[in-house]
A protein has these predicted regions:
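Terminal targeting signals and extreme-terminal segments of soluble enzymes
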Residues: 1-110
């Protein structure tokens, strides 16, 4: 596998920081801005870590400002609804300068 592919896969390994908070490193790209697809993938991973046993059904995201590759992204999660088969997770992606993106995820037991 190429180094770029391994770097991307490593970004999906989120670390727990505090309750309901995860941290992910950024893929090192030449233009020093976060790739939106990386944020989407990390949102999906954070949602599934927050509601274990459920698969992602939908993810709605708003990108609020550019993120920077030189610093980690912190994912804060909130679960407004969790039942036996469905869950809803609100996610906020933050860096030093503030909120980078927000998302709402719907998860379901398949």
């Amino acid at each position: 596998m190429s180094d770029l592919w391994n770097d991307l896969l490593g970004c999906l390994d989120l670390a727990p920081c505090e309750p309901d908070t995860w941290e992910g490193r950024s893929q090192q790209l030449e233009y020093r801005r976060l790739f939106g697809g990386q944020l989407l993938a990390q949102f999906a991973v954070a949602a599934q870590l927050t509601a274990p046993g459920k698969g992602l059904k939908s993810l709605h995201t708003q990108f609020l400002r550019e993120g920077r590759t030189g610093e980690p992204v912190r994912y804060e999660t909130e679960v407004p609804q969790q039942g036996r088969t469905f869950a809803t997770v609100r996610l906020t992606a933050r860096q030093e300068r503030g909120v980078v993106a927000v998302a709402n995820a719907s998860l379901h037991v398949w």
